[in-house]
């Protein structure tokens, strides 16, 4: 389903796969300002300070910034307004908070989230998993693609499957050590194996409902020095 949205943005939504897409989230000038600012932020490797087991050792470790929050999330880092170009993103989400809250089945006052910038170079991806929170479940997740351009053969697609896992991890599963308590699932847990994908189109916001089984396809060698650049985070 596709509907019109203010400021030339469009919304696509799938109940079957649990996603919402908002294209053209920011104006061209605002996206460029945010891109320039975020690229100058400080990045570090995922798992530099604590082990997030969703990041399998063979999938590569993305680079990310420190977190920023909208609302009281209990997370460290600045909270909106941050007096930086990150506020362009926060404000754009705030303008569409009614549609987002409705999709996540929340009241508008319940929409709180934490966000960080992520960089994936060629060869880096993220294995199949569902997002789970610390001590409490996430209310949803999102990714906003911030790179200037992206070609179809460069990989980095968001892959989504219906939740068709019926078997527990076997004791001899190579992924068992990384799967326990993390939301990480090996391909052997997927029975039907039919899903959908979303291209990392620039200026596109993708929102996922909780318990959506998904992965990030590794960025292809054809991308060269072009990195998959996004803002991503969780509704809490």
Model-flagged regions — what are they?
Residues 101-236:
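Catalytic core of non-heme Fe(II) oxygenases with the double-stranded beta-helix
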């Amino acid at each position: 389903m596709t509907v019109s949205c203010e400021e030339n943005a469009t919304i696509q939504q799938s109940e079957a796969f649990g996603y919402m897409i908002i294209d053209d989230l920011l104006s061209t000038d605002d996206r460029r300002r945010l891109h320039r600012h975020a690229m100058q932020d400080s990045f570090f490797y995922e798992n530099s300070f604590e082990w997030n087991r969703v990041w399998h050792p063979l999938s590569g470790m993305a680079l990310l910034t420190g977190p920023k929050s909208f609302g009281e999330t209990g997370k460290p880092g600045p909270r909106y307004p941050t007096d930086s170009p990150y506020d362009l993103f926060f404000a754009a989400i705030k303008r569409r908070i009614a549609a987002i809250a409705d999709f996540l089945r929340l009241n508008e006052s319940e929409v709180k989230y934490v966000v960080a910038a992520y960089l994936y170079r060629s060869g880096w991806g993220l294995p199949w998993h569902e997002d789970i929170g610390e001590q409490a479940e996430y209310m949803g997740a999102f990714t906003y693609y911030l790179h200037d351009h992206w070609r179809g053969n460069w990989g980095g697609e968001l892959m989504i499957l219906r939740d068709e896992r019926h078997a527990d991890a076997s004791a001899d599963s190579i992924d068992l050590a990384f799967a326990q308590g993390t939301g990480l699932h090996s391909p052997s847990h997927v029975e039907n194996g039919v899903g959908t994908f979303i291209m990392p189109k620039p200026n596109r916001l993708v929102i996922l409902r909780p318990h959506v089984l998904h992965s990030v396809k590794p960025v292809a060698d054809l991308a060269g020095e072009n990195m998959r650049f996004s803002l991503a985070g969780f509704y809490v």
